[in-house]
Amino acid sequence: MARSATLAAAALALCLLLAPPGLAWYKPAAGHSSYSVGRAAGLLSGLRRSPYARRSQPYRGAEPPGGAGASPELQLHPRLRSLAVCVQDVAPNLQRCERLPDGRGTYQCKANVFLSLRAADCLAA
């Protein structure tokens, strides 16, 4: 009985060690000059948006801007879609806040977010 429990524990440990790690949903930018902005911090680590993300206004077409049917000006080069973005500064504009009519006391505020696509800007602190 003890031998089978030890064998099962060893097999489980071996499976856990050999399994590839799961992908992190949030990868912080390198350096200390990046700022966390709460729940949106993980979304700022790349230019692509999730198709399931909540948007304030729905798209008029079946595909989002930059998709296969978009005009050439809106299409991004594949390299640009996978770039990491370094958040340099976040300047909230509290005078441009308005209450949303959702009945939960939610406010939508505007902010200036300064981004950089250069790795050197992210490393300099």
Curated annotation (Swiss-Prot):
It is found in: Secreted. Residues 54-73 are annotated as: Disordered. Widely expressed in the central nervous system. High levels are found in substantia nigra, hypothalamus, hippocampus, spinal cord, placenta and fetal brain; lower levels are found in testis, uterus and ovary. Also detected at high levels in colorectal adenocarcinoma. May be involved in the regulation of feeding, neuroendocrine system, memory, learning and in the afferent pain pathway. GO terms for cellular component: extracellular region. GO terms for biological process: feeding behavior; G protein-coupled receptor signaling pathway; neuropeptide signaling pathway. InterPro entries: Neuropept_B_pre, Neuropept_BW_pre. It comes from Homo sapiens. Belongs to the neuropeptide B/W family. One of its GO terms (molecular function) is G protein-coupled receptor binding. This is Neuropeptide B. Residues 56-125 form a propeptide. Keywords: Cleavage on pair of basic residues, Neuropeptide, Secreted, Signal. The keyword Signal applies.
